């Protein structure tokens, strides 16, 4: 069964979808699903916005758990909270752990002022270098989420990622993931853009050339209408 391995429900502050709606949407899309609620310790703009009661999460959602409905978490990577994050992961029976870059050196990538004074090249170099630093530190995760997260929010005319601009950094990141046995996610959120598909395809091809064998597909759904979205495009 094909799984949508990235979605947010009742325990994610920014989600407008509950678990029952997600299950119905996944069945309609004929996909399995992994709930991956947000967990971001010390989030720059609001330190408590993306935390939740993990024990209650399992207590309430365990009844839904099955071969086609799994319970995971999406951990926001930051170098100074590795110990806290990994203690949380070890303490709970997550079926899947996504590790993602939502911040760079203590700045929220969602916020426009995080890019003040930076050219696109400078912002991307910092993003890749901090991604590499975090992947070196974090051990207990399964999937590295949305490599193009920064493309959603960086305020530049061209928001795409080009392998040829930072080949050494992309290679280093991919090799770390491969050597660590981690899976690279194809996040389907931006796959409605042909330009995004074309530029991301180059990156995923390079990941494969370096020895990457596995990818995951994730819609990053926060609404029921987005569960399983663009999975056919991602499969190609």
Residue ranges and their predicted role:
Residues 38-39, 102, 149, 189:
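Flexible loop residues that form catalytic
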């Amino acid at each position: 069964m094909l799984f949508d391995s990235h979605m947010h429900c009742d325990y994610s502050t920014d989600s407008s979808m509950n678990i029952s709606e997600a299950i119905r949407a996944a069945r309609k899309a004929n996909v399995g699903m992994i709930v991956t609620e947000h967990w971001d310790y010390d989030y720059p703009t609001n330190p408590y916005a993306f935390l939740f009661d993990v024990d209650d999460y399992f207590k309430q959602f365990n009844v839904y758990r099955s071969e086609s409905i799994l319970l995971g978490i999406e951990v926001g990577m930051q170098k100074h909270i590795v110990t806290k994050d990994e203690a949380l992961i070890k303490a709970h029976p997550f079926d899947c752990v996504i590790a993602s870059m939502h911040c760079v050196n203590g700045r929220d990538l969602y916020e426009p002022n995080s890019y003040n004074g930076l050219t696109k090249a400078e912002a991307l170099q910092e993003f890749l270098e901090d991604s590499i630093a975090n992947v070196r530190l974090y051990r207990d995760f399964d999937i590295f989420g949305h490599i193009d997260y920064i493309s959603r929010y960086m305020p530049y005319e061209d928001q795409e990622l080009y392998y040829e601009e930072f080949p050494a950094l992309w290679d280093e990141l991919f090799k770390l993931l491969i050597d660590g046995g981690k899976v690279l996610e194809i996040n389907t959120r931006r796959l409605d853009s042909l330009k995004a598909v074309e530029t991301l395809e180059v990156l995923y091809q390079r990941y494969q050339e370096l020895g990457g064998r596995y990818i995951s597909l994730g819609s990053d759904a926060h609404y029921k209408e987005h569960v399983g979205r663009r999975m056919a495009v991602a499969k190609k």
